[in-house]
Amino acid sequence: MRKLKFYVILILFLVGVNCFIIERYWVRFQEYEFKSDKVTKDFDGYKIAVVSDLHYGFLNPEFWVRWVIKRVNSQNADLAVGLGDYVKKRNTDVELLKVWPILKELKAKDGAYFVNGNHDHWANDKLSLELLEKSGRSIRNKNIVIRRNISKFILAGIGDFWEDRTDIDKILSGTFSKDLRIVLSHNPDSSNTKHKEKVDLFLTGHTHGGQVRIPFFNFSPVLPVKDSNFDIGFKKNKFGEDVFISAGIGWSILPIRFFCPSEISLIVLRSP
């Protein structure tokens, strides 16, 4: 009986260490390939580093966030994107003012671009948008062209689904559907908003991959989205478009992760 009790306590201890420390703080770099007829040979192998849901603040201190950004930079990605929820607390300016100088250290060959998430708005709606625009790296409600030789693709970003404007057709106006179009959005539910312009790939976060996933069944019992299909990895929206959901880095509500480690997603474009 004592031996059984010892093993039960040991298992619970190891699970606790895994949930509270290992999976939360040991950020993995996971590659995902996206293949499309619109990816030209010039962009074959093009790597996009996805930074989502940092949630700087309680239990995610400044030195750790800086370490994460340095690790992303060490990947020497072609492009880096921030998908929002950079802070945790509501109704405070402090975390926003501290995290943005760190975010601006994010580097890639073709630059780093950002959109905001709901937590950024909840901290201070006006200030979060002001800091985003002042960073010089905002892609909120706009688009840019990324070029390689004579090839190009469109990178666009939309405001948060819960707290900002989401007008996909407007931000893609003036672009052409023959070109690859990648849209950044914090919340994957944004992809289900009505739009006529074709999007080839949405890059999103928000769900933390469910944060807690049931082993063997590979699902999360709690997801902060309308469409329960949007948990982690590549999914399809109701228009048949590809949506990628990153597991992200931080946590919400409970400071744990279970079978869902913190992650920097690396999207690798592939031509046919």
Predicted regions and their residues:
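Binuclear metal-dependent hydrolase catalytic cores centered on His/Asp/Glu-rich metal-binding motifs
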Residues: E130-R137, R148-S185, S191-T193, E197, ...
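Mobile, glycine- and charge-enriched loop segments
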Residues: V27, E31-N60, I158-P188
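N-terminal membrane-anchoring alpha-helices
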Residues: M1-D42
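Conserved acidic residues
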Residues: D78, D85, D179-R181, D200
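Beta-strand-turn-beta hairpins that frame and shape the catalytic cleft
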Residues: K35-A49, I144-A156, F176-K178, K236-V243, ...
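Active-site metal-binding loops of divalent metal-dependent hydrolases
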Residues: V51-Y56, G84-V87, N118-H119, K142-N143, ...
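Conserved beta-sheet core of the metallophosphoesterase superfamily
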Residues: P188-S265, P272
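Membrane-embedded segments
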Residues: D42-R140
